[in-house]
Each structure stands twice: as structure tokens, then as C-alpha cells.
UniProtKB/Swiss-Prot annotation:
The gene is hemC. Binds 1 dipyrromethane group covalently. Keywords: Chlorophyll biosynthesis, Porphyrin biosynthesis, Transferase. It comes from Synechococcus sp. (strain CC9605). PROSITE patterns: PORPHOBILINOGEN_DEAM (PS00533). This is Porphobilinogen deaminase. Pathway: Porphyrin-containing compound metabolism; protoporphyrin-IX biosynthesis; coproporphyrinogen-III from 5-aminolevulinate: step 2/4; Porphyrin-containing compound metabolism; chlorophyll biosynthesis. The modification S-(dipyrrolylmethanemethyl)cysteine is found at residue 245. The porphobilinogen subunits are added to the dipyrromethane group. Monomer. Its cofactor is dipyrromethane. Transmembrane segments: none annotated.
Amino acid sequence: MALTELRIASRRSQLAMVQTNWVKAELEKAHPGLKITVEAMATQGDKILDVALAKIGDKGLFTKELEAQMLVDRADIAVHSLKDLPTNLPEGLMLGCITEREDPADALVVNAKNQAYKLETLPEGSVVGTSSLRRLAQLRHHYPHLIFKDVRGNVITRLEKLDSGDYDCLILAAAGLGRLGFSDRIHQLIPGEISLHAVGQGALGIECVEGKPEVLEAIKVLEHTPTSQRCLAERAFLRELEGGCQVPIGVNTRFEGDQLILTGMVASLDGKRLIRDQTSGEASEAEAIGIALANTLKGQGAGEILKEIFETVRPEA
């Protein structure tokens, strides 16, 4: 049966709506005549802004409300920043499509008085804003002389806090800045040697209901196979480590010929212990590559580090 209507669930933040509207426009181009509607809503992660993300909890912080709409048949798909989508999805839902990835790097953004500095030259005591334990742990490892403070709110709110002097610089995803039209605020792209990016960073994931082949077929036009292979390896790595979106686990993937090379990292919260390794294999074996690297890092002590973190960063009741 031909699909005549498609209902999209989305977060209502500015970045989420930019991403969802891009998906909507691309699907309308691919399927002329298809009626597409969007329902935007706030998630738990959007509502709680006075508590560090890791203290709120990790399971579906930015996705659960969208998934609930699909499970009661009020939406057919949900558009996510793939880095926010847990690796284990609710029964009845599936990751139907992964779009072409934007630059997955982390970016340094500075205020007017710090334009002369790069990350590696920031003076001792400079205040760096980040809400990510992954960024925090890696930057503490390389730059223990800097001060790190949590920063919450949407991208525009964070930039306002930076420019008002609350912070000397921020670490944000380059892809999100670009999608919002703030590429000119990127002062420095942070190399992977310093900060491996989050699993799925820079890509969009379209989640859908299982058992609706016409919906899956409609959204597959946005699938980007190289990105999908890279992200499937990254997500398998994260899942095998039993990590989540709010733990210090970083990755990088790249192709060399038909080989997919995955680099992965686990760090302690204080940055003093950082385990990093890489593995490779055929791109068609993406999940196996991720699982293999996770087990390699476990053998080097990653499991003990993560256990300590889970015991330290418990969600607040």
C-alpha cells in the first residue's frame, strides 16, 4: 500500500527543528504528494536545565517522549541527533535510517577577549564550558591546568553565556553550530588526537516503528551507506561497553580503501586514566569491528573505569 501521510515526532529546540525540517523537505522532494506533518515536543533533557546531564540519567534523555508518540501510533518516525539515541531501543521501534554525516569534530568557541588563543595556548585557569563528560575527561587529561564548568541550555543560550563572560570558551559540536548558521563562531576544530567525538556525532538517526515497511521504504532514500557503516561500528562499540550518551567514551571512524578503521577511547572522570586503541575490518562487518574493539579495551581496564563512573555519577532521585 502506497504511503500517503507521514507523521514526524521531533524535539522542539531550534537545532532539532532545523534538522527535522531538513528531513521533511528531503522526503517531500523524494516523494511528491506525500503529506508530512511534524509534532514538536520538549523532552526530559530539554526541561531540566539546572542539573548536569549525567546526574539526570542516561536512558532516552532526549528521545523517550518522541518514542512514546510512535508507540501509541501518534507518529510514524522520530528525527534524532544520532549521538542522543540510546543503542538499545524500546521493543517495537528500530533505527530505520542514518543520514550523511556532517563534520563530527568537537569545536572550540571563544569570546571576544580570547580570540588570540587556541585550546593548547589558553592561559592557566581559563574557564571552559562543556556539558559532556566525554569532552571533560579528555580535556582534563591533556589540559589539567584549565577549569571546567558545566553549561546547559540550547546552543544560542550557551553562546550568550559565553559572550557575557561566564566562560572563556565553550566546546560544542561543529555539526550543530553549522546547522544553526554559526560556523563563523568555530575558532578551532579540535583534532581527534585530543578529543575523540561522540558515537554518532554529526549524523541524524531516523527511528521508526517496526512492521511498517512502507514507512521504512520511504525514509531509506535518506540513508547514506558509508555513514551508516561508520555509525553502526561506533554504536556496537558503545553497546558492548554498556556505556551511554553521558559517559566518557569517544570514537573516530574512517575508511582506508574497503577497510573501516575504528578508534575508541574510555577515560576516567578526572582524565588521569585514558585507554585508547583501534581496530579495523571489512566495512560490511561494522558491528563486529565495534564489538571487537570494545572487548580489546575491556581487556585493558575500560570496564573497571566505567564501573567507577557509574558508581560516582548516579542519577539524582
